[in-house]
Amino acid sequence: MYLGVLLGGISREREISIRSGKRIAQALRNMGHVVDEIDVDDNFIYKLSELKKYDALFNILHGTFGEDGKMQAILDSIGIPYTGSGVETSVIAFDKYLCNLFVENTIERYEELSVVKIPNFLLISSEEFEESKIYMIEEKIGLPCVVKPRKEGSSIGTHICFSKEELLDALKNEFKNYDEMIVQEYIKGKEITVSVIDINGTPTVLPILELRPKKLFYDYEAKYTDGMTEFIIPAELDGETTEKINHAVLKIYKSLGCKHFSRIDGIVKDGVFYFLEVNTLPGMTELSDLPMSANAFGISFDELVDLIIKEACRKL
């Protein structure tokens, strides 16, 4: 097939997208496809008319514009097959507040999600924030707590705060970059990520990956710097817990309407899976989680990207 790989973008994850995109493009070439790398930069509007020439597009943009439903809406209007979830799913998954509400509602409706909980959370707006509200946040969420942007990826802008002073500093600093922040209960346990891919139209859960970062948590540096994280696959969980988490993740994936490939992150503590987020366009670098899980499942990187692009074309 004649394929285009959408990479780069205008978000703070641009460099990671380029790393992922170039690796994907080479893998697709290895599988016999003709591939162009399309940099989604400030001049992308002038490239739109050329997109129809491709049989399909592999979208590996991260963050704003690429992962939040905007690019998906553009590609839908053009009518070209693309990898990843559609507009509605992308909008919800990229918005951590909306996604928490969605998963909360899903937990209430399905018995197999009884293993899942969502850490307590608050949405804080820069317009409404006052220093005096720190005490209210501490009372409702407790310390330590996690501060993260409502809409962002790769743990950019994320802090773990152990005191009111750290919480105040984190909010003040991040409100320079974001209008809204989430303050969430900190759960200390096994940090895991569960990848799901579609195989012949059937969502399939890959082996659970346990993350043991050398830093306090799996932040941007730990994700993309070699040697900063120990990866355990399969995760060191008992069989019953593993089975329950797999069923729960599959239900979340299907209920949200995820397509082709996604990753669901969380913390396991005392047999409970504390949901953190859904990533509908997970990284595909040499250090990324989903390719590791696929490899443990017996799928090479070249086979993985070939499978994903072919799944995207199934909807024709």
UniProtKB/Swiss-Prot annotation:
- Which reaction is this enzyme known to catalyze? 2 D-alanine + ATP = D-alanyl-D-alanine + ADP + phosphate + H(+)
Coarse class of the primary localization is cytoplasm
Q: Is the keyword Amino-acid biosynthesis in the record?
A: no
Q: Name one GO cellular component term.
A: cytoplasm
> From which organism does this entry originate?
Fervidobacterium nodosum (strain ATCC 35602 / DSM 5306 / Rt17-B1)
Q: Where does ATP bind?
A: 138-193
**Functional pathway:** Cell wall biogenesis; peptidoglycan biosynthesis
UniProt remark on cofactor binding: Binds 2 magnesium or manganese ions per subunit.
This chain's function reads:
Cell wall formation.
Similarity comment: Belongs to the D-alanine--D-alanine ligase family.
Q: Which cofactor does it need?
A: Mg(2+); Mn(2+)
Which Enzyme Commission numbers does its entry carry?
6.3.2.4
Group of enzyme by EC: ligase
Protein name per the record: D-alanine--D-alanine ligase
Q: Which InterPro entries match?
A: ATP-grasp, ATP_grasp_subdomain_1, D-Ala_lig_Van_CS, D_ala_D_ala, Dala_Dala_lig_C, Dala_Dala_lig_N, PreATP-grasp_dom_sf
Listed GO molecular functions?
ATP binding; D-alanine-D-alanine ligase activity; metal ion binding
Task: Write out the entry's keywords from A to Z.
Answer: ATP-binding, Cell shape, Cell wall biogenesis/degradation, Cytoplasm, Ligase, Magnesium, Manganese, Metal-binding, Nucleotide-binding, Peptidoglycan synthesis
GO term, biological process aspect, one = cell wall organization
What is the annotated localization of this protein? Cytoplasm
Species lineage, top-down? Bacteria, Thermotogati, Thermotogota, Thermotogae, Thermotogales
